[in-house]
């Protein structure tokens, strides 16, 4: 089959070579963006007097027809035409005749594909920002229900100090807020137009790059034509931001998996987000949480792959850069799917309040309260730490907890201990006293919730 660029060649490639080099199996994802960019380009060609108005109207009418078919999923693509750009150009020529071949005036596939990807990511990143905000709303709603639910806080996966469960949930809220900020910031760089940069050096036609940028809703243009067609930073930044977001979801998934186990029993994941075993009738597996955790590695891989592709490419465009798309598409699908699943999982999970609170009474996570108690009475903290460490050892040897020790044992360790030590040891008291800014005290958690609510209710 004759290539649209085949004039310089004496023979055509073998079919299997065409298949190896073709990107249409995956870049057809850009079909709507490609047509939208072409409509703006055609409009500009007319306004600048580069093409006659009657040609422009025919071209635009044909493109709008193709766009409608694309939205209905009625376009059929061919590997023979390599990529989305040549497929659309061939369809346009078939639709309106040879005048369709004038569309590519003053344009290269290099600036065309870059424009497509900017348009694509602008749309997808905006969707991801909204999905993050929806998940944040779910976290706030769940946190509001559990301000005074006490749960062990962990370091090294060992019980450390009792905390408000809402405080734990809000830790993820703020991680997600940073993610949302990063994606919002990235839109400044995504929303620049490379259209009109040509292959790399611009064009001799009197085009208006600012006009096409305006028509496509871009904030401005790339200032250097070589940079415009060479840049894939905006995709790498998207993949990097996505990797951090997925890392945060993965960490939370790890906790959900642990908490839903019989060893913890802190939560129960809703049946809609779990599966069973083909051999063990009793099993309820947290598969969706495990899948999100696993898919995080997939997103990391997409980031590393594109960094590796780009590290050795000289300016300007190289065919290597065709490898920028599959990882981008895959990451968009993975991130959007993970956010939707995760929000549903958190919204429907059952929190076993009694189990959580019972756990805080069967450990030594209140030991810091004893050290603080002595420090407040003038004992140097390191000395207080030593005293409490010995009391913990006594408990371990006796098989009891700190609240079980009689007052005379405390007084033997330090005469500064009084009867009020037992109130300080209560998990509820221990949590509520930690009212430093950003702490787990109930008043601080309620303040944090108010801030979080304002954030999620701001567009």
Curated annotation (Swiss-Prot):
Pathway: Amino-acid biosynthesis; L-arginine biosynthesis; L-arginine from L-ornithine and carbamoyl phosphate: step 3/3. It catalyses: 2-(N(omega)-L-arginino)succinate = fumarate + L-arginine. Disulfide bonds: none annotated. One of its GO terms (biological process) is arginine biosynthetic process via ornithine. Keywords: Amino-acid biosynthesis, Arginine biosynthesis, Cytoplasm, Lyase. Pfam families: ASL_C2 (PF14698), Lyase_1 (PF00206). This is Argininosuccinate lyase. It comes from Geobacillus sp. (strain WCH70).
């Amino acid at each position: 089959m004759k290539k649209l660029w085949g004039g310089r060649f004496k023979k055509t490639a073998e079919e299997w070579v065409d298949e190896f080099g073709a990107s249409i199996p995956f870049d057809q994802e850009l079909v709507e963006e490609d047509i939208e960019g072409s409509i703006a380009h055609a409009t500009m060609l007319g306004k600048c007097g580069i093409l006659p108005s009657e040609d422009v109207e025919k071209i635009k009418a044909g493109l709008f027809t193709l766009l409608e078919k694309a939205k209905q999923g009625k376009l059929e693509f061919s590997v023979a035409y390599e990529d989305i750009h040549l497929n659309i150009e061939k369809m346009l020529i078939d639709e309106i005749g040879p005048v369709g071949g004038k569309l590519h005036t003053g344009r290269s596939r290099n600036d065309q594909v870059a424009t497509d990807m900017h348009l694509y990511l602008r749309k997808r990143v905006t969707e991801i920002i909204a999905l993050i905000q929806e998940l944040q709303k779910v976290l706030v709603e769940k946190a509001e229900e559990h301000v005074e639910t006490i749960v062990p806080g962990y370091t090294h996966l060992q019980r450390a100090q009792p905390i408000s469960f809402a405080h734990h949930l809000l830790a993820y809220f703020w991680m997600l807020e940073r993610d949302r900020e990063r994606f919002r910031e990235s839109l400044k760089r995504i929303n620049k137009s490379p259209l009109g940069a040509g292959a790399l050096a611009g064009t001799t036609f009197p085009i208006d790059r600012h006009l096409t940028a305006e028509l496509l809703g871009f904030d401005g243009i790339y200032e250097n034509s070589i940079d415009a067609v060479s840049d894939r930073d905006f995709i790498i930044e998207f993949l990097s931001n996505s990797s951090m977001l997925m890392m945060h979801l993965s960490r939370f998934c790890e906790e959900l998996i642990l908490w839903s186990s019989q060893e913890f029993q802190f939560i129960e994941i809703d049946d809609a987000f779990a599966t069973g075993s083909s051999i063990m009738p009793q099993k309820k597996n947290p598969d969706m949480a495990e899948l999100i955790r696993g898919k995080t590695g997939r997103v990391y891989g997409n980031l590393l792959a594109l960094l590796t592709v780009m590290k050795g490419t000289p300016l300007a465009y190289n065919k290597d850069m065709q490898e920028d798309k599959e990882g981008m598409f895959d990451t968009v699908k993975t991130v959007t799917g993970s956010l939707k699943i995760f929000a549903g999982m958190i919204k429907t999970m059952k929190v076993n309040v009694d189990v959580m609170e019972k756990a805080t009474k069967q450990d030594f996570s209140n030991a810091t309260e004893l050290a603080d108690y002595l420090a407040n009475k003038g004992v140097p903290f390191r000395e207080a730490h030593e005293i409490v460490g010995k009391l913990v050892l006594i408990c371990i040897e006796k098989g009891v907890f700190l609240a079980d020790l009689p007052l005379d044992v405390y007084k033997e360790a330090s005469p500064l201990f009084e009867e009020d030590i037992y109130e300080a040891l209560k998990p509820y008291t221990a949590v509520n006293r930690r009212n430093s800014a950003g702490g787990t005290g109930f008043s601080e958690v309620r303040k944090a919730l108010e801030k979080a609510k304002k954030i999620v209710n701001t567009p």
